[in-house]
Structures are given as C-alpha cells and as structure tokens.
C-alpha cells in the first residue's frame, strides 16, 4: 500500500453561514485535491467531465447527473481528469436545519457505506427541473425569492430522500471500487479528529510508509 503525507493531511474546508447554499461550477484545472471534510453535509450533482469521487474508502466512477451524498465529517476528495471541463452542482446543508428529517439520506448513506444516487431517465428529469428552478430562484431578485428558494430546496431534498431511502436509484456494483485498508484508516481518522493524527502515528498504526507516494484508489 502506498500512502503519503497528502493522504494524512485531511483538513476541514469550507464554511457555511446559511441553512443551505447552492453552487454551479464549471472549470478545467490540473489541481489535485487532498482528502478533506466539512462540518456540514454536501450533495454533489455531477453534470459533465471525467471524474471519480473518493468517499471513506470507496471510489465512485461518475456518470452525468449522478448524485453523491457526503455526510458531515466524511473524509473525501474528487479525482478530476483535467483533459475536459468538470461541471457540477454542489449543495451545502447545515446540520442544524429546522427540517431534520431531510438529513436522513446522509445518515442512511453512512449506514449503508454507499453514497451514490444514480437515476433512471424519468427521475433524472424530475430532479434536473427542480435543481435548475432552485438555481434560478436563488439568483433572482424577484418578489418572494427567499420563500420560493426555500420551497424548491425542500422539494429537492424530499425527493432525494424518497429516492435514496426507498432505493429507487440504480445500483451498480461496477460503479465503485473499494480499498479496505484505506477505509479503515479513514474511519479511524474520522472518529479521532481531536487526537494525534500525525503521519508518524498513523504510519506506525497501519504499518505503511510515510515516504511513499499517494495511492489512487
């Protein structure tokens, strides 16, 4: 197993002051993302490009309009092919929102150790419509913008929970690969964020060299 300091240097990134926030991003970069985590929940909606998403030891190979559920404190990173533009929606959600039942999908993803929501064409169109309406409402300055934006966010999350909790998504074992040792290391880090997580400590605990290059899972 090849691990490096970059693997161990998991850090908290991003700050969220609102109940939720939506981003629509498109870029093309050679940046390599390190493992990191957030204090809030995150939904990633992959639109186009070539990308894999690593979450807690699983690497999901993404198809257009795949949705990923990233629980707060879950250690993760995207792996992007820089040869083509990478487009996605990112939805950040506070853990203390008034609608706690809408966070069930994140807990269930954690319980199942499975984070991918791959939709059939009908559900895909439904979710796309709500998502684009949500984006347009959030950017507008029309009357009732905040109420409509909140309503569309709630719609999106209700349908997302229905789809995931009721297993209406397409399950494909070939959509991900799994590395049990990396999963074990990440789980240890995730549950001991306030402890000594130095490269030396983790290397000794898991019998891996701190001098070797980053493994791609």
Feature-to-residue mapping (PLM):
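Linker/hinge segments immediately adjacent to helix-turn-helix/homeobox DNA-binding domains
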Residues: 157-170
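Short, locally clustered residues in the helix-turn-helix/winged-helix DNA-binding domain
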Residues: 47, 161, 190, 194
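Ligand-binding loop in jelly-roll beta-barrel domains
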Residues: 73-98
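Amphipathic alpha-helical segments enriched in hydrophobic/aromatic residues interleaved with Lys/Arg
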Residues: 106-155, 159, 187
């Amino acid at each position: 197993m090849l691990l490096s300091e970059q693997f161990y240097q998991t850090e908290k990134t991003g700050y969220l002051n609102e109940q939720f926030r939506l981003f629509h991003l498109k870029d093309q970069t050679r940046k390599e993302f390190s493992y990191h985590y957030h204090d809030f929940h995150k939904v990633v909606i992959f639109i186009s490009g070539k990308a894999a998403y690593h979450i807690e030891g699983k690497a999901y190979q993404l198809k257009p309009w795949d949705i990923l559920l990233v629980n707060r404190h879950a250690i993760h990173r995207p792996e992007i092919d820089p040869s083509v533009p990478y487009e996605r929606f990112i939805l950040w959600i506070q853990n203390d929102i008034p609608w706690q039942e809408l966070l069930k999908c994140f807990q269930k993803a954690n319980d199942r150790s499975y984070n991918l929501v791959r939709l059939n064409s009908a559900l895909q169109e439904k979710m796309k419509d709500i998502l684009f309406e949500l984006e347009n409402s959030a950017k507008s300055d029309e009357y009732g913008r905040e109420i409509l934006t909140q309503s569309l966010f709630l719609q999106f999350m209700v349908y997302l929970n229905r789809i995931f909790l009721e297993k209406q998504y397409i399950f494909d074992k070939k959509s991900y690969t799994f590395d049990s040792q990396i999963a074990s290391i990440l789980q240890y880090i995730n549950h001991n964020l306030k402890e000594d997580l130095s490269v030396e400590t983790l290397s000794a605990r898991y019998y891996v060299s701190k001098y070797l290059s980053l493994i791609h899972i």
